[in-house]
Amino acid sequence: AEFTVTQAINIVRHFNHVQRKMRLHDFRWEASILSQSIKDLKVAVIGTGHIGGIVAQIFSEGYLCDVVAYDPFPSEHVKPYVTYKQSINEAIKEADIVTIHMPSTQYNNYLFNENMFQMFKKGAVFVNCARGSLVDTKALLSAIEQGQIKGAALDTYEYEIGVYTTDRSEEGLNDPLLEELITREDIIVTPHIAFYTEEAIKHLIFDALDATMEVLNTGTTELRVN
């Protein structure tokens, strides 16, 4: 959740562009790096499960943002921080930041496509720290090129399997679409690392050990998925 908020702010504050200027020793305060105050922005959280709910809380309580949300199963724990909308379209249409937090299913592949991006408020920021298959990457790039979307932070990518977690510094990517994402200043791309903290890795290890002991003792585990 904290990673999502950080990346959203980095896009709003033109982080990549500022860093490029710094590397060039260009320290001018130009219109291209003028930003907005986060507290003045409306945020749409699509999917308010555990992570989405925390994102909503951080934006609402930490930054005093107006937060709207959509989830087919609204959470009572999240309601103090958001105004739930009846549809995704209604949630995104006036949002300055749209962040998505939902699992990948057979029903939501390319949910965020050309038609969906055209419903965004012009100049909105898009954040995907959920699943790459939710987003039509080419449609997103087109929306950014047209100025419909200001920029995006992507911790997931639809073709990441077999690429992310590997070192391609010698052999190259052979993926023009990912290359374009990486080289653009208005997009921040990271290799699915939002979860990658010391605390999270500890939890993964302990959960695996607990599940192993549970299977040995009972023949099954509450973490069983099949």
Walk through the language-model features, giving the residues of each.
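Short, well-ordered coil/turn residues at beta-beta hairpins
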Residues: 7, 99-104, 128-129
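Short, charged, surface-exposed secondary-structure boundary motifs
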Residues: 1-3, 78-81, 95, 161-165
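Short gly/ser/thr-rich secondary-structure transition/capping motifs
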Residues: 22-30, 78-85, 106-111, 133-134, ...
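Mid-domain beta-loop-alpha active-site segment that forms a flexible
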Residues: 1-3, 7, 49-50, 55, ...
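Rossmann-like dinucleotide-binding domain for NAD(H)/NADP(H)
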Residues: 123, 131-226
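Rossmann-like dinucleotide/phosphate-binding beta-alpha-beta segment
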Residues: 32-122
